[in-house]
Amino acid sequence: MMALYSFSTDLRIRCAADYKSVFDGALFKVHQPHFLFLAKLTEQPNSRLGIVVAKKKVRRAHERNRIKRLARESFRLHQPKFGSDIDVVVMPKVGIETITNAELYQQLDFAWQKLQRLAKKHSKVVPTSQN
């Protein structure tokens, strides 16, 4: 039986200050052909997701909604696998509306796996202060 994971409000980046924090202090950047992921470690008890889909990048509202829906669903399924708590902002690139849902989901899957590897590697490297 597959585990059910929710996507409650505490798993979302909601305020502008939190988005700014990720944009200004991103420790990890993951590039895919149609996505850019920015991420940083957080003090929050959970990993959180923010999605920025500008009209300039994706003109049609139904395409913006499709991208956001797939990004949320993908995050919801991958979030329990993160080794540490991170804030992630997902930004689509120009031309994303031309690819299918399957291709989009595959790119998201690759990006989450790469982000998980980077976060685990970083958590092993960070020294603890001994004063």
Curated annotation (Swiss-Prot):
The keyword Transmembrane does not apply. Keywords: Endonuclease, Hydrolase, Nuclease, RNA-binding, tRNA processing. Gene3D superfamilies: 3.30.230.10. It comes from the Bacteria. The keyword Calcium does not apply. PROSITE patterns: RIBONUCLEASE_P. Disulfide bonds: none annotated. It catalyses: Endonucleolytic cleavage of RNA, removing 5'-extranucleotides from tRNA precursor. It is an enzyme of class 3 (hydrolase). RNaseP catalyzes the removal of the 5'-leader sequence from pre-tRNA to produce the mature 5'-terminus. It can also cleave other RNA substrates such as 4.5S RNA. The protein component plays an auxiliary but essential role in vivo by binding to the 5'-leader sequence and broadening the substrate specificity of the ribozyme. Belongs to the RnpA family. This is Ribonuclease P protein component.
